[in-house]
Amino acid sequence: KTWPAESVRAAAAAGQRRFGENYVQEGVGKATELSGLGLEWHFIGPLQSNKTRAVAETFAWVHSVDRLKIAERLAEQRPEALPPLQVCVQVNVSNEASKHGVPLDAAGALMMQIARLPRLRLRGLMAIPAPNPDYEAQRRALRPVRELFERLRADGLAIDTLSMGMSHDLEAAIAEGATLVRVGTAIFGERSKAGA
């Protein structure tokens, strides 16, 4: 996010194929501008109902589904000509009302509902814990997500993706079973602050 299409183009030239975006308009613009490069676009930011069509038409993955209404809109708006939209349910690991995501104890029921929707393929869970510089604290924050993921798989839910870990906590996330990490700062550098 906030990096120009030229930065994405340079990373693609170095072999990177998957790119994540937090902001719908910015992501759609980059995906359109770089459409000839065969890149896979992942939407990882909060998603509002009025933005679902643009996401359904542009992105290959959505990591931040936390309400059935959003999943239903994505399913309705995913073009038939495109492969099913790959979806992760975002869980709120900090139990803070200000954070996005469904509570851990409600994720399983939501996932069962999403798994039945057409044009979507439920892939797993996504989490963004509160930043913490301590490795063991990072692992403790992510462990309940891994445990939920394992329980859901044991219960027969066909999921394979645990999307957690960013530049500051990817080692802890991998140790806790992450199958997909979202690394931006370590590749592109610190984002410039608005107005700076």
Segments predicted by a language model, with ranges:
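Gly/Pro- and small hydrophobic-enriched strand-loop and loop-to-helix capping segments
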Residues: 178-196
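Conserved alpha/beta-domain cores
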Residues: 2-168, 174-176, 188-190
